[in-house]
Amino acid sequence: ALLAIADANKKAQTFKSVVNNVNFALESMARNLRTGSNYSSEAFLQTSSCSTGYKVGISFTSQEDESVSYFLFGTQIMRQVNGGTAVGITAPEVKITRLCLEILGTESGDNIQPNVLMIVGGLMEGKTKLQSRFDIQTLITQRIIDN
């Protein structure tokens, strides 16, 4: 019984670490999009894992005036700054199976604040073969007032 409790505790700690990684990666992405501007997804493919109009990546201008892109590569969300080397922002234990991004409100005079609908789905796998599926949807609105 003691070994079962220890094993359950180990699984819970591993799972918590993976969940924290997903939370950190997606919150960082959302924060950067919220404080950025000039959203575009023209350079990215349309994804078949979501409805029409969604893309697998997004580019924008950060508050530091850098060109930033987030996109799905294999099973990892990548971040690229100013055309440099793309870096994964999700841990290897997190397998992203879909990243769907839809940009709304970027047309001039549409009276809609630019925003991005983001849907992320995947699997979290711990070292103990504990696996859990997740789907997250969030709407990110640009802070800079649209003209």
Predicted regions and their residues:
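Aliphatic-rich helix starts adjacent to a transmembrane/signal segment
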Residues: A1-A30
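Aromatic-acidic/polar surface patches that form glycan- and anion
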Residues: V18, V22, N111, K129
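Short, cationic motifs built from Arg/Lys/His that form the positively charged side of catalytic pockets
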Residues: N23, R34, M78-R79, R143
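Low-complexity, S/T/G/P-rich flexible repeat/linker segments used as non-globular hinges
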Residues: T85-P92, I96-E102, Q113-N147
